[in-house]
Amino acid sequence: MPDAKRKQKPPVSVTVSIIGAGRLGTALAVALADKSYSIQSLVARTAASARKAAKLLDPLDDTAQVLAAKNLGSLQPADLFLITTPDDQIAHVASELARLENTRARAQKPTALHTSGALSAEVLAPLRKRGWSTGSIHPLISVSGSTTALDGAFWSIEGDKTALRVGKTIVRDLGGKSFSIRSEDKPLYHAAAVMSAGNVVALFDVALEMLMQCGLDRKTARSILLPLLASTVHNLETKDPAAALTGTFARGDIETVKRHLKALKTNKDALELYRLLGKRSLKLTKDHPQITQMLDSV
């Protein structure tokens, strides 16, 4: 008699091996398993890390192979290989998989997709030369943990025809939205993502530092600035940047800019950021040559 507690999975046709059980790799494993993909293998830096990720799939289902990275040669065959390692390890993983492929005969070659935002499918060339379909899928979402919800996320996809089809299917099944870009544009695309996410965090940290110089503690400064940031994001949801811009540069307030520049003289990093972003803000507004000249002279 079957175990009544064991979760019954619908039949699936796609087996998946995930190499790199970090935050994104584990989040993908959990999300794909929830959509009835069969997680064949999980590879992490250590077997213990892989087992930890596997337990998040289904505590009652221990069928997934767990491997330490050093034992990649024992990896079982699968239809799809997702390489979710750091960027500087992807080429090595591709070479190892290609070497492993030499010892196996397949009627149908698998697909390999990596999840780097900056690298194209070209980094998987060793696999392409073995007849694999190769590509990349990258989620435009901050993955803060293994249970990060991927539903509704935008994903960039590039690669060969089969890889594009597989990538689009995965994104659709995960409740996301996909768009394709040229392989050579991956670095520019990823830089745009960094500008709108990571660099915003860095800029927010500079603003915190400035308020702390005013005598506020960091926690209070954060509480004060977060609603302002949230209101700006809300404006950008419905308006073009030129219409969403408010404040000193939108008004062309010359005297206030003078006061800001004077106050920032002792903070070189903040001063340089203020100058560069101020000039960009002026491009979104009516021309204010006096302010531009002031910023250029700093």
Describe the residue ranges of each PLM region:
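NAD(P)+-binding Rossmann beta1-loop-alpha1 motif at the extreme N-terminus of oxidoreductases
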Residues: 2-73
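Short, well-ordered alpha-helices that flank and scaffold nucleotide-derived cofactor binding pockets
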Residues: 26, 30-34, 55, 95, ...
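Rossmann-like NAD(P)(H) cofactor-binding subdomain of soluble oxidoreductases
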Residues: 47, 60-148
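Short, charged/polar "capping" segments at the starts of alpha-helices
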Residues: 48-52, 120-123, 163-165, 291
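Internal alpha-helical scaffold of NAD(P)-dependent oxidoreductase catalytic cores
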Residues: 51-56, 60, 127-133, 148-238
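Interdomain hinge/lid region at the active-site interface
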Residues: 234-291
